[in-house]
From Swiss-Prot:
The UvrABC repair system catalyzes the recognition and processing of DNA lesions. A damage recognition complex composed of 2 UvrA and 2 UvrB subunits scans DNA for abnormalities. Upon binding of the UvrA(2)B(2) complex to a putative damaged site, the DNA wraps around one UvrB monomer. DNA wrap is dependent on ATP binding by UvrB and probably causes local melting of the DNA helix, facilitating insertion of UvrB beta-hairpin between the DNA strands. Then UvrB probes one DNA strand for the presence of a lesion. It is found in: Cytoplasm. One of its GO terms (biological process) is nucleotide-excision repair, DNA damage recognition. ATP binds at G40, A41, T42, G43, T44, G45, K46, T47. The keyword ATP-binding applies. It comes from Gloeobacter violaceus (strain ATCC 29082 / PCC 7421). PANTHER family: UVRABC SYSTEM PROTEIN B. Its main location: cytoplasm. Residues 27-422 form the Helicase ATP-binding domain. This is UvrABC system protein B. Belongs to the UvrB family.
C-alpha cells in the first residue's frame, strides 16, 4: 500500500462556520468519537467541510448516499477536491434488474433477468482494487453496497502477482487467468478477457480500460507494460503489479467441491422435509433444479443464480452476515452518511423486502433455505461493522443526533448535542429564504401572479403539491395561461430527471411542479421561489423535516422566498418557520459583523453527473450521429451519452481494422465529450 495522504485542492478556503465545524469533527474523529453529526443548512458547503475533515483525519472513507444520482454528484465534487487521491464510485451495476420471484396466487414463476452496465462494473472493480493498494481512498456508494460482494480474503488471495524477472510458465499464467474468471479471446480483447500472441500475453483487467501486456523470454517475465487500448502504444512500463479477478465472487476449486457436497446434504434434508409435509411437487421441483445447478457448478464452476448458493461457496454458517464492500476497507475506516435522515431508513429497510421475496421461493421449492443467506446486511450487522461515522444532513433524524450525544429541545424543537457540529453560514452570504403563510382560498391565482413576477426577472419557481392528481391539474392550468411549466413525477427515471432539472436551470421552462421529488439533493441556484400548497395538511410530506428540506430549495438565491398556503399554523409549520428565522438571524448578524454582502451562487450549467455517460438515454439516427461526430462541441448535453456509446463502437471497429489514426480521432472526440459532461 502507498502512504499517500489526502490533499484538498480548492480555489477557496473554509469560511463562516466551516472552520469551526471542520475542527470539531476532525478532533472528534481523531479522538475516537464513534458518532458525530454535521447539521448543515442547504448551500453552506457541507461537502467541502467533509472533504477537509477527510484530509485531516486521513482514513479511508466510505461516503453513503441514498441514490445513484446523488452518489454521482458527490463523486464529481469530491474528485474536484481530491484530484491526486483515489475517489471511486460504487453503485449497483444493473441498468435493468428483475429479481427472481414466484406469485403463488397465479402460479407464476418469474425468472431473474438483468442488464449489467459494463462501465459501472469497471468502476466497482476499480474501487475494490484501490482499497487493496492504497490508503488515500474515498468510495462514494449507494446503499446497495451492503449487498454481498464476495470475500475480500479470497479475492485478494486469487490475485495474480507479476514481477519482471520472476519465473512463471506462460501456460501457468493462462491457467491462473482462467481460474480467476478471465476468458481467452484472441480476436476481441476487452474487460475480463486475454489473448496470446507468441511470447506475449495481453490482458484486459476488470478494473481498468487500459491493457496489460506481459512479455516472456522463455519462462521468465521480461517486461510488464500498460498499453493504450486503441493505439496499442505503451503508456508506461512497471516492475510489478497484481492482476485482480474478473469477478468479485471467487471460489477456489477445492472449496467449490466442498460447497457442492454441502449443497447436496442440504438438498437431501430439504427433500425429506417437503416429502414429510406431503409437498411432493415442491420436493420434485427443488430436487430437479438443484441437481442441474450442481452439475453446472462441477462442470464449468458457474450456474444461473449462483449467488443463491453463496453461503456454501463462502463456507459461512447459517444466518451469518455476508461479506460486502465494507469488508474490503481496513480496520480504521470512516463512514460519512449523506442526507442521513433518508439514507439510514434505507439501510434498515433493505433486508426486509429481500427476505419476504426469498421466503416465497423457498416455501414453494424454487430455492433451498440457504438462499435466504444471499442477502443485504441487516441494520444491526451494518452498524456492528462501523468504527466511526459522521452523519450529514440539514435535518438529521432523532436517532443520529442521540447517537451523537444530543437531542431535541422540547420547547424550540432545535437539534443540538456534544458531538453535533452546526453549519449555518453560507460562504456567499446568502440568507435562508423568507417564509410567508397565505390562505388557501385563491392560492392558485395568487401563485400565478408570483410566477409572473419571477419569470419577468428570469428566475425559476418550484411548486410542491400533496397529490399526483393536483400536480397534473395545476400543470395543465398554468400551461393554458401561457406559463412554461413541467411536471416531475415518480415514474421518471434518474437520467431523464437530470435532463429536466438541467432544462429548468437553462430556462427551457420556468416552473417545475412535483409531489415528493423537490427536497433532498436539488442544487438549483436559479430558483427564487418555492410554493408549498396545502402546507397545513399534517403528514409525512408536510412534517417538520420535509418542510425544512423543501424550504432549503430556495436557499441558494439572493432573493429566495417560500410561500406556504395554509388556513392554520400546524406544529410542523411553526417549528420549520422558527428554525428558518433563527438561521436568518444568525446569518444576518454574521454578514453585518464581517461586512458581507450576499452574492448569487454561480454554478456552471454544463457541470453534470457522472451518470450521464454511464447510461444511454436515447438513440441517435445515423445522420445525427455523423453531424454530432463532426462537431462534438455543438452537441446537446442530452445527446452526449449516446454519442459516446456509438463513437466507442466505431473506435473499436477502426482499431480492429488496424486504422489507428481514425481510432485515435474517435478516442479524442470521446475524451472531449466526457470532459464536457463532467464540466471540465
Amino acid at each position: 500500500m502507498t502512504d499517500d495522504r489526502f490533499v484538498v485542492s480548492a480555489p477557496y478556503r473554509p469560511t463562516g462556520d466551516q472552520p469551526r465545524a471542520i475542527a470539531q469533527l476532525s478532533a472528534g474523529a481523531l479522538g475516537g468519537v464513534t458518532f458525530q453529526t454535521l447539521l448543515g443548512a442547504t448551500g453552506t458547503g457541507k461537502t467541502f467541510t467533509i472533504a477537509n475533515v477527510i484530509e485531516k483525519v486521513g482514513k479511508p472513507t466510505l461516503v453513503l448516499a441514498h441514490n445513484k444520482t446523488l452518489a454521482a454528484q458527490l463523486c464529481n465534487e469530491l474528485r474536484e477536491f481530491f484530484p491526486d487521491n483515489a475517489v471511486e464510485y460504487f453503485v449497483s451495476y444493473y441498468d435493468y434488474y428483475q429479481p427472481e420471484a414466484y406469485i403463488p396466487q397465479t402460479d407464476t414463476y418469474i425468472e431473474k433477468s438483468a442488464s449489467i452496465n459494463d462501465e459501472i462494473d469497471m468502476l466497482r472493480h476499480s474501487a475494490t482494487r484501490s482499497l487493496f493498494e492504497r490508503r488515500d481512498v474515498i468510495v462514494v456508494a449507494s446503499v446497495s453496497c451492503i449487498y454481498g460482494l464476495g470475500m475480500p480474503e479470497e479475492y485478494l488471495r486469487a490475485a495474480i502477482p507479476l514481477k519482471v524477472g520472476s519465473n512463471i510458465d506462460q501456460r501457468e499464467l493462462l491457467r491462473q487467468l482462467v481460474t480467476v474468471q478471465y476468458e481467452r479471446n484472441d480476436i476481441d480483447l476487452g474487460r475480463g478477457r486475454f489473448r496470446v500472441r507468441g511470447d506475449v500475453v495481453e490482458i484486459g483487467p476488470a478494473y481498468e480500460d487500459r491493457i496489460i501486456r506481459v512479455e516472456f523470454f522463455g519462462d521468465e517475465v521480461e517486461a510488464v507494460r500498460w498499453l493504450d487500448p486503441v493505439t496499442g502504444e505503451v503508456v508506461r512500463s512497471v516492475n510489478s503489479l497484481n492482476i485482480y479477478p474478473a469477478k468479485h465472487f471467487v471460489t477456489p476449486e477445492e472449496q467449490l467441491e466442498q460447497a457442492c457436497i454441502a449443497i447436496e446434504q442440504e438438498l437431501e434434508a430439504r427433500v425429506a422435509e417437503l416429502e414429510g409435509e406431503n409437498k411432493l411437487l415442491e420436493a420434485q421441483r427443488i430436487k430437479q433444479r438443484t441437481r442441474y445447478d450442481l452439475e453446472m457448478l462441477r462442470e464449468v464452476g458457474y450456474c444461473n443464480g449462483v449467488e443463491n448458493y453463496s453461503r456454501h461457496l463462502a463456507a459461512r454458517r447459517p444466518g451469518e452476515a455476508p461479506s460486502c464492500l465494507i469488508d474490503y476497507f481496513p480496520q480504521d475506516w470512516l463512514l460519512v452518511v449523506d442526507e442521513s435522515h433518508v439514507t439510514i431508513p434505507q439501510i434498515r429497510g433493505m433486508y426486509n423486502g429481500d427476505a419476504q421475496r426469498k421466503k416465497v421461493l423457498i416455501d414453494h421449492g424454487f430455492r433451498l433455505p440457504s438462499a435466504a443467506d444471499n442477502r443485504p446486511l441487516k441494520a444491526p450487522e451494518f452498524w456492528d461493522k462501523v468504527r466511526q461515522a459522521i452523519f450529514v444532513s440539514a435535518t438529521p433524524g432523532d436517532w443520529e443526533v442521540e447517537l451523537s450525544g444530543g437531542g431535541r429541545d422540547p420547547e424550540t424543537g432545535r437539534m443540538a448535542g456534544e458531538h453535533v457540529a452546526e453549519q449555518i453560514i453560507r460562504p456567499t452570504g446568502v440568507l435562508d429564504p423568507e417564509v410567508f403563510v397565505r390562505p388557501v382560498a385563491g392560492q392558485v391565482d395568487d401563485l400565478l401572479h408570483e410566477i409572473h413576477d419571477r419569470v419577468a426577472r428570469r428566475e425559476r419557481v418550484l411548486v410542491t403539491t400533496l397529490t399526483k392528481r393536483m400536480a397534473e391539474d395545476l400543470t395543465e392550468y398554468f400551461q393554458e395561461r401561457g406559463v412554461k411549466v413541467r411536471y416531475l413525477h415518480s415514474e421518471i427515471q434518474a437520467i431523464e430527471r437530470i435532463e429536466i432539472l438541467q432544462a429548468l436551470r437553462q430556462g427551457d421552462f420556468d416552473v417545475l411542479i412535483g409531489v415528493n421529488l423537490l427536497r433532498e439533493g436539488l442544487d438549483l441556484p436559479e430558483v427564487s421561489l418555492v410554493a408549498i400548497l396545502d402546507a397545513d395538511k399534517e403528514g409525512f410530506l408536510r412534517a417538520e423535516r420535509s418542510l425544512i428540506q423543501t424550504i432549503g430549495r430556495a436557499a441558494r438565491h439572493v432573493r429566495g422566498q417560500v410561500i406556504m398556503y395554509a388556513d392554520r399554523l400546524t406544529a410542523s409549520m411553526d417549528k420549520a418557520i422558527s428554525e428558518t428565522e433563527r438561521r436568518r438571524q444568525i446569518q444576518r448578524a454574521y454578514n453585518a459583523a464581517h461586512g458581507l454582502t450576499p452574492q448569487p451562487i454561480v454554478k456552471r450549467l454544463d457541470a453534470n453527473s457522472i451518470l450521464d455517460y454511464l447510461a444511454v438515454s436515447r438513440r441517435l439516427n445515423q445522420q445525427e450521429l455523423e453531424a454530432a461526430a463532426a462537431a462534438p462541441a455543438e452537441v446537446a448535453l442530452a445527446d452526449i451519452p449516446e454519442l459516446v456509446s456509438q463513437l466507442e463502437i466505431q473506435m473499436r471497429d477502426a482499431a480492429k481494422k488496424l486504422e489507428f489514426e481514425k481510432a485515435a480521432e474517435y478516442r479524442d472526440k470521446i475524451h472531449k465529450l466526457r470532459e464536457r459532461l463532467l464540466g471540465k
